[in-house]
Amino acid sequence: MPASASTRTIRILGPLALCAALAGLTGTAHAVPEAQFQSAFQQFLQASGGNSNAIEQAAEAFSGLSNRATTNPVVLAYAGAATAMRATTTMLPWKKMGYAEDGLAQLDKALTLLTPAHDAAVHNGTPGVLEVKFVAANTFLAVPGFMHRQERGAKLLGEVLNSALLAGAPLGFKGSVWLKAANEATKAGNPAEAKRYLDLIVQQKAPQAAQAQALLKGAST
């Protein structure tokens, strides 16, 4: 994954807005110091980018943060995603299943914690509801089919794509969502839909534009 804040798959924090409307949310948001969140997030990015050594660190970091901020769905979603990734670090079948199931359970809980207050940013410039759903969608779509999460993952991705909140999200986050949608469309054998999302990335000059252009070029050859 790209290392800069503007090019990350999942964007990092901007200032909280609408403070008066978020009186019930600020307690959970402040429960995790931003510096600690960013440190854990950097480890998560490395893990997501293929650094297997960072998976354990990311899982431990976000699990620790979620234990302190038990009602923060964004932190819990990252904890769940990182825990699920730990399934790739062991050859033991029962450990693989344990990590995957524990991570999915955390993601399920994070989704249940979402309220209208999370339409605003929690730890990102992206609305918390979109971030949690996108993290969950990525994980659900990545786990093996026998875990029966693909349908829900596709549904969550669709909810993010169709949300009115997406228009106001950071361009980097939107680009990540469109790129994921394009990849899923390609997997589903729908090249026209994939091209539509890739074209959108390029037209909007999202940070993922170079990657989208490469995919478009590959599809045309």
Predicted regions and their residues:
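Structural register within alpha-helical repeat arrays
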Residues: 79, 86, 136, 140, ...
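Start-of-helix signal in alpha-solenoid helical-repeat scaffolds, especially tetratricopeptide repeats
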Residues: 33-37, 55, 73, 77-80, ...
